[in-house]
Swiss-Prot record:
This is PAS domain-containing protein cky-1. One of its GO terms (molecular function) is DNA-binding transcription factor activity, RNA polymerase II-specific. Residues 76-129 form the bHLH domain. Residues 45-89, 436-462 are annotated as: Disordered. Residues 165-215 form the PAS domain.
Length: 676
């Protein structure tokens, strides 16, 4: 028998998958498999009378232990067994070739299969046929009775899913992988199944525990059936260690057992062998977009849309699906600030990652955010931010050196809660380059040049906080005069960032397994999932990256000064869900890039008019209503007295100027004003 080589996905070429195989084909597969086993364990009855029989435990027809030279002693005479072994191997090869011909695959795929792969695929198709008759057939009959019209033939219903279909037994044995899996994983179904007949052959070893825990729990009882469950795992389709890192694919599994526990108990009671038919778990698998596959997955996927933004995150372009999900036309989105749609809880993290992209002019980052559509509904998005060079000219004739491309993947509440419980995905180092270079795009002037991440943080100028514009649809109250919205600003000093702590953790430090969620955690359909899942969220701290000089790094961390803020935050400040964020930003750089995008004049004008009415009796107050420099640079004459006055009276306004029954927009604006 020819020696089998290790299985590699590169050993195959793509091809179309044939039909699933009928009853006759499955019976023929079983018949060939039986003959292969009979040939392996035979005692040489097919040989002539002069041949020497090999014991039954000699599995592959090789000579016995005492005859390594291919001979054996019978009645004192030495006879050769090489001919018997070769004939037995030829019989096995013939039966395996019959199995190969019966597989419902294309000829191009069959010709590239090794013998071990033929046996593995044969087991998968035989197991699939067996479960179709016992477990799946009653479910199909029930679905056909519920349907008013029969399902047309030749239609692939998996195209309507947000991912590919996967069916496994409770022990992890693969029953079915839908044909559209190649569109998401980049490998044909045959290549995926040839990795092994178990799901654990495809899943990364660090996630074996999470997958096993989900499958081992078994189907629920009829009282709670069905029970949807969502979990994340990493699929690793490369068998070589050198290719594992770049071929990791984060996949979001959402599925359930297709029958309650009572069904399998009754089914196994009718069989002579206990646990003959295991429960079947069916799930559709949705790969998460990443900087490598985001552009490819956005094509033809109705749950992925893309947008383009200027460096201040104002919309430049949007595709058709963006208008469909957000409720705005392309013309309405152009020029609109992206920060005006984001939930305030996500502003600190997004502002920090946005600043990194604007600083380095390269790289990509991931984020889990909520955007508000035109109808006021919040939608969860798994987003990839990438900055790319650009040669276009704007309306003023100036060249747009860089454009930020965003790819958004829409999620359900349960999927978003699962990703929130696995927030380490959004702080992995592979989502952002470890080596930076800013030589490809010099800024037009030195005044607007962002500093390097190694630049010491500012200690004299605290970060600027300006009032955020109101929620979509909230206009200016009648009677307010048109004033310059750049006149009122609030400064809050914060602790400088520690440059010794890495911004993103390396991929190798990711957890050994992922967290999962069930529908039982969401008792109400409209309940906010993260409000009841705070106890399972991981720590927000980021551990330093320890290299060779461990003692030196620890000594630098211990000696780094930790300056306490000069003024405490108001009681209504909410800094939840910060996702391992640093505690401070560089004020000047943050204000340069986020000032024009974050803040609009409407809401600030309301606060300015309110403060003018309250303090008309104080003409000698230090606050002077004079124009200030443009939004691209912070005010130069903004002193400590201005901060004390604005901090005090803005607090009074936020605490005492609320209506008896606060409206949703007021709550949003109060949180937005302090979000950064």
């Amino acid at each position: 028998m020819s020696t089998t080589v290790p299985l590699h996905a590169s050993s195959f070429s793509s091809g179309t998958t044939g039909a699933g195989g009928g009853v006759q084909q499955a019976l023929q597969l079983q018949h060939c498999a039986y003959h292969v086993g009979a040939s392996v364990g035979s005692s040489g009855s097919a040989l002539n009378n002069n041949s020497i029989n090999v014991p039954n435990n000699n599995t592959m027809g090789m000579s016995s232990a005492g005859s390594s030279n291919g001979s054996n002693l019978v009645n004192g005479q030495q006879r050769s067994t090489r001919g018997a072994s070769k004939q037995r191997r030829d019989q096995i090869n013939v039966e395996i070739q019959k199995l190969r011909d019966l597989l419902p695959l294309s000829d191009l795929i069959k010709d590239r299969l090794f013998q071990l792969q033929v046996m593995s695929l044969g087991c998968i198709f035989i197991r699939k046929h067996r479960y179709q008759q016992t477990v799946l057939q009653p479910q199909l009959q029930m679905l056909q009775m519920q349907m008013s019209s029969p399902m047309p033939r030749g239609i692939d219903i998996c195209k309507a899913l947000r991912g590919f279909m996967l069916m496994v037994t409770r022990s992890g044995k693969i029953l079915h992988v839908s044909d559209n899996a190649s569109e998401y994983l980049g490998h044909s179904v045959e290549e995926i199944m040839c990795q092994g007949d178990s799901i654990y052959d495809l899943v990364d070893g660090r996630d074996h525990g999470a997958v096993q825990a989900e499958l081992a729990s078994g189907p629920p009882g009829a009282a709670t059936f069905p029970e949807e469950r969502v979990f994340i795992c990493r699929l690793n389709l490369a068998r070589t260690a050198k290719r594992q890192l770049q071929y990791h694919k984060f996949v979001l599994f959402q599925g359930r057992y297709i029958q309650p526990a009572e069904f399998y108990q009754q089914l196994n009671a009718q069989n002579s062998q206990p646990d003959c038919d295991q429960p079947v778990f069916s799930a559709y698998c949705q790969p998460l977009i990443n900087p490598e596959n985001a552009e490819g997955m956005s094509t033809g996927n109705t749950h992925v849309f893309s947008t383009q933004h200027y460096l201040d995150m104002k919309f430049k372009e949007a595709d058709t699906m963006a208008s469909q999900h957000l409720g705005f036309s392309k013309e309405q989105l152009k020029g609109m600030s992206w920060y005006g749609m984001i939930h305030p809880n996500h502003v600190p993290e997004i502002a920090h990652k946005h600043r990194l992209l604007c600083q380095e002019k390269e790289g990509s980052v991931l984020a889990l955010i909520r955007l508000q559509a035109a109808n006021g509904e919040w939608i969860w998005l798994h987003t990839v931010f990438s900055i790319r060079p650009n040669n276009e000219l704007n309306s003023d004739g100036k060249r747009l050196r860089h454009v930020i491309h965003c790819f958004h993947q829409k999620l359900t509440d349960l999927e978003a809660a699962t990703l929130q419980a696995n927030s380490w995905i959004y702080s992995m180092r592979h989502t952002y380059p470890t080596v930076f270079s800013c030589q490809d795009s010099p800024p037009p002037s030195e005044e607007q040049q962002p500093s390097s991440p190694q630049t010491p943080p500012f200690t004299e100028q605290p970060p600027m906080l300006v009032e955020q514009k109101p929620l979509i649809g909230a206009g200016i109250a009648p009677g307010f005069p048109s004033l310059d919205y750049n006149q009122i600003k609030v400064e809050i000093p914060m602790r400088p960032i520690n440059t010794q702590i890495p911004l993103f953790t390396p991929e190798s430090s990711s957890p050994e397994s992922s967290a999962s969620l069930h529908t039982s955690l969401l008792p109400h359909h409209n309940a906010f999932p993260l409000d009841i899942l705070e106890d399972i969220l991981p720590s927000n701290d980021v551990l330093p990256e320890l290299k060779d000089e461990v003692d030196e790094i620890l000594r630098q961390v211990e000696q780094s000064p930790a300056t306490s803020p000069a003024h405490s935050f108001p009681s209504n400040v909410n800094f939840g869900h910060r996702h391992s964020m640093p505690n401070a930003f560089d004020s000047a750089e943050l204000y340069k890039y986020l000032g024009p995008a974050l803040f609009d004049g409407n809401f600030a004008m309301q606060h300015q008019h309110h403060l003018q009415q309250q303090h008309q009796s104080q003409p000698n107050h230090p606050l002077q209503m004079t124009p200030i420099p443009p939004m691209s640079c912070p005010p130069s004459n903004y002193g400590q007295s201005n901060f004390l006055f604005h901090h005090q009276h803005l607090n009074q306004h936020l605490h005492h100027s609320q209506p008896p029954h606060p409206y949703h927009f007021d709550y949003y604006n109060r949180k937005r004003s302090w979000a950064v």
